[in-house]
Amino acid sequence: GSGEILKLSAAAFTGPDKKIVTANPTFESIARHASVAGADVVKIDLASDYSHDLKKMLAAANGAGLVYICNPNNPTASITPAKEIADFLGKLSPATIVLVDEAYHHYVESKDYESVIPLVKDYPHLMVARTFSKIYGMAGLRCGYCVTQTGNIRRLRNHQAFDSVNIMALVA
């Protein structure tokens, strides 16, 4: 579903001179795509409570093209509160894109969780990936979407093939 967004983000925002910072463990797809793009992959271990260690991720993000936060995290199901992500965004260089992958947001029942989509209007360097694959049972259709500001969409589109979304997914 959102795999295309992860692939395009790695192509658009990482490379030999732009590393990616991600958690460990987390969903590995984007790290693989960034590695193919020639980027250094910096993995920051989760904190002892399995949350993202945003302080260490911030320290590692100097010169990064992309920071990836899977929220809720896959495979740990840990969540990072939106306020903590907002604080992180405020401290991070606006030249570094933050991609928050909310593929499993439909399954969260914790009162501590909220989507970061409302933050997109205030943070031009924030992108949020979502998928229809999980809750809607559309895994085979490979359809997802990205919420971000226009400039980031333009950069993604520069790397997108004309047929990256199949006709069945578009109809669905």
List PLM regions with ranges:
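Conserved core of the PLP fold type I
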Residues: 1-93, 104-122, 127
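PLP-dependent aminotransferase class I/II
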Residues: 125-172
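Short beta-strand/loop segment that forms part of the nucleotide-sugar
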Residues: 98-103
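Bulky hydrophobic/aromatic packing residues
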Residues: 52, 68-70, 97, 154, ...
